[in-house]
């Protein structure tokens, strides 16, 4: 992964766009730059997974094999750009120059997919989506994860993610002992000393890291984060709709790279954050599906209450019941032996 792509992705990838270019719910991004962020996100995702974005086929005429070829070229062009594109005009120019030998219909479709201008004299119509004052207050840092494993989803509001330690933030915080252990593990595996390799992996895991296999079977040293979705509370696994909530979160995040805004750490050591994936705000999706409550004891954002109210009115998910048990009351009763 090139540093230039990492920098822009980490710098400006806020909630992006859903299928693919729709203004993202007033979280402070502008239509002049959100397409650049979405493109950076998708190139980052492609380099980690070799997957092209969902929904692109509806905008272009060429096959998925051809689309994969475009993303290989665009990834290379982005890495080599100095500086990388930071405006819609610059992103448009990079796409047009990189794909100049390809069909015009495909190039135009790709630009439309990202909401980018179709010429190099754009953005006079760009408008800014006004963010609610509290939208990003208190964000301590931002994570860009590796693809999520199905076993990482604990329930409807908790997921374990891993972040590549080549990420600039992680690289600066990586303990030397963990880095050395990963290097020694690779050497042990190379000579088939799996006993030593497994022991080193255990040391790495105990330190909060893990060596994962990349898409080309390369080793990726990654840091582990347990994420508690901020502002929602889903039914516990043994409660009605607990299974459905977990399955919905699996459907939304598994196999995908996430952007996570971290606000704090809870008493269980989990990082409390907002999760975005492929242009979707995950808490919004869970609330609208009727698979979570707005956790008002810890979150006062009015938009989350509106999404819950919408699901209640439609009687979807757990709101099909006239009086569903609240998970925080269920947990309290369990603690009290009721």
From Swiss-Prot:
Keyword Metal-binding: no
InterPro entries per the UniProt record, alphabetical: SNase_OB-fold_sf (IPR035437), Staphylococal_nuclease_OB-fold (IPR016071), Thermonucl_AS (IPR002071)
UniProt entry keywords in alphabetical sequence: Endonuclease, Hydrolase, Nuclease
Enzyme active site: 228, 236, 270
Domain of life: Eukaryota
Entries under PROSITE patterns matching the protein: TNASE_2, TNASE_3
UniProt-listed SUPFAM superfamilies: Staphylococcal nuclease (SSF50199)
Keyword Chloroplast: no
Protein name: Uncharacterized 38.1 kDa protein
Species name: Capnoides sempervirens
């Amino acid at each position: 992964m090139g540093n230039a792509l990492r920098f822009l992705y980490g710098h400006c990838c806020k909630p992006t766009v859903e299928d693919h270019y729709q203004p993202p719910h007033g979280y402070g991004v502008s239509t002049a730059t959100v397409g650049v962020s979405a493109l950076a996100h998708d190139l980052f995702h492609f380099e980690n997974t070799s997957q092209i974005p969902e929904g692109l086929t509806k905008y272009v005429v060429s096959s998925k094999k051809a689309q994969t070829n475009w993303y290989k070229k665009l990834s290379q062009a982005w890495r080599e750009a100095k500086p990388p594109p930071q405006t819609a005009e610059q992103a448009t120019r990079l796409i047009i120059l990189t794909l100049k030998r390809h069909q015009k219909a495909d190039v135009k479709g790709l630009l439309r997919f990202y909401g980018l201008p179709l010429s190099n004299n754009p953005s006079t119509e760009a408008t800014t989506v006004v963010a609610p004052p509290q939208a990003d207050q208190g964000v301590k840092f931002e994570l860009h994860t590796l693809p999520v494993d199905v076993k990482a989803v604990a329930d409807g509001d908790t997921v374990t993610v891993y972040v590549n330690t080549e990420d600039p933030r992680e690289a600066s915080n990586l303990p030397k002992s963990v880095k050395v252990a990963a290097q020694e593990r690779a050497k042990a595996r190379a000579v088939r000393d799996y006993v030593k390799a497994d022991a080193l992996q255990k040391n790495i895991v105990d330190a909060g890291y893990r060596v994962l296999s990349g898409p080309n079977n390369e080793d990726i040293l990654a840091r582990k984060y347990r994420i508690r979705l901020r502002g929602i509370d889903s039914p516990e696994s043994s409660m009605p709709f607990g299974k459905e909530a977990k399955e919905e979160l699996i459907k939304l995040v598994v196999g995908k790279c996430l952007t996570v805004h971290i606000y704090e750490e809870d008493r269980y050591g989990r990082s409390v954050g907002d999760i975005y994936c492929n242009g979707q705000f995950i808490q919004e999706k869970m609330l609208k599906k009727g698979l979570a409550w707005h956790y008002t004891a810890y979150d006062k954002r009015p938009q989350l209450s509106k999404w819950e109210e919408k699901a209640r009115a439609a009687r979807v998910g757990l709101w099909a019941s006239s009086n569903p048990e609240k998970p925080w009351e269920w947990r309290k009763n369990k603690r009290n032996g009721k």
